[in-house]
């Protein structure tokens, strides 16, 4: 099989493919194991990095309110909460994901990465935001999550204590942070995204 399918690069490609189909409604995506949240190590074993993308998409509201070049904003009907999804993907990589499955195809991937290894600078402006908000930030990179444990196979989840399992899944999870802010009409943010990086911002009205 194509080695890219199980890698940390697959979420960026899938998101690019989904975003290419524009619409005013978000498809509902359900995680196979809802109790595990963004955990990659579950009682059924180690899940692939694309599972994290599904967990992020599940947080999007059902109505698309803005969409453009590598960004998407959604809102849940009847609520003031807004979710903004940003990503950095170059369509020149499409043929490597859509082509054959030979391992030799990793060579052109490395060459393309050399030519397109640049950060994308994004300025985000969210208006008509007044009041207290909890802002959750999730950052998903192209890192191969299981690589750090390659020399030590992960044990079955039921062999680990609840605390060890919690910490282990924390090391495998996307980078997460939370800010509590009082907004007076707008929110501005400038940031940089590395190739294949995905960022989800969730604005929750308190």
Model-derived features: positions:
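Aromatic/acidic polysaccharide-binding cleft in carbohydrate-active enzymes
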Residues: 1-105
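Generic secondary-structure transition motif, activating predominantly at the C-termini of alpha-helices
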Residues: 45, 55-62, 130, 141-145, ...
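Carbohydrate-binding surface patches
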Residues: 70-153, 195-202
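C-terminal beta-strand-rich structural cap/linker in extracellular carbohydrate-active enzymes
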Residues: 160-206
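Short, solvent-exposed coil/turn segments
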Residues: 36, 47, 117-119, 182-186
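A structural motif corresponding to the C-terminal end of an alpha-helix
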Residues: 20-26, 57-62, 125-129, 180-183, ...
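An alpha-helical appendage that flanks or caps ligand/catalytic pockets
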Residues: 136, 143-174
């Amino acid at each position: 099989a194509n080695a890219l399918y199980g890698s940390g690069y697959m979420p960026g490609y899938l998101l690019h493919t989904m975003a290419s189909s524009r619409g005013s409604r978000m498809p509902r995506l359900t995680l196979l194991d809802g109790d595990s949240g963004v955990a990659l190590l579950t009682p059924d074993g180690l899940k692939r990095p694309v599972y994290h993308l599904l967990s992020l998409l599940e947080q999007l509201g059902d109505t698309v309110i803005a969409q453009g070049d590598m960004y998407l904003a959604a809102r849940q009907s009847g609520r003031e909460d807004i979710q903004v999804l940003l990503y950095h993907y170059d369509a020149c990589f499409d043929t490597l994901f859509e082509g054959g499955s030979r391992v030799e195809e990793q060579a052109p991937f490395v060459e393309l990465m050399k030519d397109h290894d640049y950060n994308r600078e994004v300025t985000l402006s969210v208006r008509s935001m007044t009041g207290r908000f909890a802002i959750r930030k999730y950052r998903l990179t192209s890192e191969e999550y299981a690589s750090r444990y390659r020399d030590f196979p992960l044990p079955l989840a039921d062999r680990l204590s609840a605390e060890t399992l919690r910490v282990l899944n924390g090391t495998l999870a996307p980078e997460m942070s939370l800010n509590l802010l009082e907004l007076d009409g707008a929110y501005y943010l400038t940031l940089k995204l590395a190739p294949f990086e995905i960022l989800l911002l969730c604005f929750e009205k308190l």
